[in-house]
Amino acid sequence: MDFDVKQIKRDMDRLYEFLEKGNNSLMYPTDVNTLENMSANILGGVKSSIESKYKYSKVKDINKKNEDKLLRALEDNQVYLNTMASSITDIYDSCDYIYMPMDDALECKSKSDIICTLLEFMKSVSDRDYEITKSMFRNGLVSDEFYNPMYGGVCNWSYYLQKCYVLLFTGLSHYGNGCILSHEIGHAIDFYKYALPYGQIKPYYKCFFDEVPSTFYERIFLDYIKDKKIDEKAIDVYFNRRSFPFICYADDVIDFYDYMSEGYDNGNIKSEELYNYNDSFNYFIGYYVSLHLAVLYRKDKKKALEILDEICSNRLYFDYDIGQIIDYFKIDIDSFIDGDYVEPYIRKRVLDFNKRFNISSTL
């Protein structure tokens, strides 16, 4: 599983030439970021100066408009998001969750077996998802040959090239890594099925729901491996590990609203601070909504996929509207924002891990 490096170099040359002509006003930031990231990780930093050339001339205009929009959205959705975040931290606290990385206890699996399982899983979701995933591997657009300690993986996409590139930085030695890969492949599926054909050119600040499809595929792949007893231990360990950032993102959401309640002034927050909070909000919402989708998927696959399709198709029209998402689920609002719908699932997964590793509730 490795990139066709020669083809990628040709792709990056084409992208660089396109951006050099100043044609990136609509493409920023995804194409510039793709060139930057692929150059840094794959081509040793070649052409990396393109970022500095456009960073300030293009981003400033984009940022101000989207900053104002994001700030209004955070204020408008405060009741929803603050309650959702508090509910998640309360649920994990009440079911004796303890962050305990146990990757060293996992049995190594062959890369080919993990990829085969991933393809079988995608086939079980839909033929289209399977074809996209298979094409990514066949065309040398997925690699686990590069290491970056800051990230588990990344999916870079280019509207100009109409391609995605997935890098898995953890290697592919067990099914926990496979879940990270399914997350990044989920971004690629999102790109090919929605972002590209619908012309969803993304602003510098993501909308609230950009991490929903990727985290959804990650969660249902996790359940697929667990339910089929392919490697239950790896999934128990992975759920424990991935729950930790979910809780951290929830804490960030709570912290932000505490800040707002202490006399927050729109003019006082710096762009880089808002960008960092935006990341936390996106991932928290992605995890939260996809968790509800994954629980629904176990009960009604068709309905869950229909809701995912609605979210991905229409997100630029309601990019910051949590209420619209709740309407799609057609469940009680309180049940959604209080976490009642997903609490049994979380408790079961935490209990499975604690039982497996003999973790006492008194710890």
Regions from the PLM with identified roles:
Residues 34, 38-167, 350, 354-358:
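Contiguous, non-catalytic segments that form substrate-binding/exosite surfaces or channel walls
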Residues 57-60, 125-128, 192-201, 221-235, ...:
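Inter-helical turn/loop segments and adjacent helix faces that build the functional surface
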Residues 163-182:
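Short pre-active-site segment immediately N-terminal to the catalytic Zn-binding motif
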Residues 179-180, 191-216:
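Post-HEXXH active-site segment of zinc metalloproteases
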Residues 219-293:
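Long, amphipathic alpha-helical stalk/connector segments used for oligomerization, subunit docking
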